């Protein structure tokens, strides 16, 4: 009480108020102001929830282009494993997704010969060291695929490599030493092929700092179209671990070969030749020169099919790929680049309503789910067909529920549900008014017109009038591949 009285007298002197008047004012104050603040009962012992902080790349629609990866190391003393900082795709952490571990980004390069350019270099390493390390990191991928990588020193390259700092033009700033090490962008994105390394990291060759080889090889995997994987010891694992020597895991290899196929074997020594002496046994093998695709303006085609909305022309083991009427870069290419184990040449091809792709050769057929083989070789007799091969296959109708097989002057209707032709006795192609009696290939366009190819010519069939349009046949080369118009054009 004595202490309170002293305090009141001090306040009274400070405010120049008589003590009785000060006591009166205190009695008139509301009781809420005189009570000590205390938390509500239901919050007193409740722990504070901490909201996790998401990386910018984890926020949907927050950036113009989502990068393929950020390598994020923790402090050396931390027990948390070092990892790539971009959130993993949901399937990567799905416990049910065990058989196929590798995850694709949804994009891939449409050619196999890629160029790269290094714009700026880290200060810790001489330029030649960086060039050798980048080449070695790319070689990890080229050794198991048909991909090749060539360094260029000016202009725009397919893969642009840069060592940069903080804000550098892609809304994904670096953060100085530690933290984010690098990021890369997938194919078919706004910044496809860009690979950025944080200039402020301690870049080294080996485990005495941040190993450039390990990080570069991982980022190049993203640039080629691979996402993260949960497979143990995979280079594309989101967790950063120094490994020596650097190599791909079986999961990495399966993923990249799913996108680009296996490497093409070429002789590395002078080509051996067979002995010219008749009857002489020899174990020398005469290796053929690498095949070259036929001249598109001068060839006929073995098969044509609309696959995933794009037009594929097949000839002698090669394929031409047209999207919106334009031949895509990197084509013609070997058909085995997309469909491993596919025989050459194919006689016919079509895509059914479920997206499965059927190929025919001789008395057998194969079925692929995208680029994954699911059936074959299987005999044509399984489909109710006997005798000689199918020459052409046509998917007709908006729902892809009408499939026709052509052979010579005959045709059959095939039912995907029963996996059989409706009648083993064929009908005559004269039912298709104006179509030649024998055809090489057939397909349907997005507007419902059917096309029949024979030799260098094609016929366009009207589904409403049920006959070939006037002014046909037309030459294939000028209309599909911008070849010069022949002098004897059919009009």
From Swiss-Prot:
Transmembrane segments: none annotated. Disulfide bonds join 297-483. The active site is at 219. It holds the Pfam family Peptidase_M10. It comes from the Eukaryota. It is found in: Secreted, Extracellular space, Extracellular matrix. Hemopexin repeats lie at residues 298-342, 343-385, 387-435, 436-483. Its cofactor is Ca(2+); Zn(2+). Induction: In skin fibroblasts of superficial dermis upon skin lesion with highest level between days 5-10. Gene3D superfamilies: Collagenase (Catalytic Domain), Hemopexin-like domain. One of its GO terms (biological process) is proteolysis. Residues 1-35 form the signal peptide. Highly expressed in ovary and uterus. A motif (Cysteine switch) lies at residues 82-89. One of its GO terms (cellular component) is extracellular matrix. Keywords: Calcium, Cleavage on pair of basic residues, Collagen degradation, Disulfide bond, Extracellular matrix, Hydrolase, Metal-binding, Metalloprotease, Protease, Repeat, Secreted, Signal, Zinc, Zymogen. Residues 263-277 have a biased composition (Low complexity). CDD domains: HX (cd00094), ZnMc_MMP (cd04278). Residues 36-101 form a propeptide. Belongs to the peptidase M10A family. May play an important role in the progression of epithelial malignancies. This is Stromelysin-3.
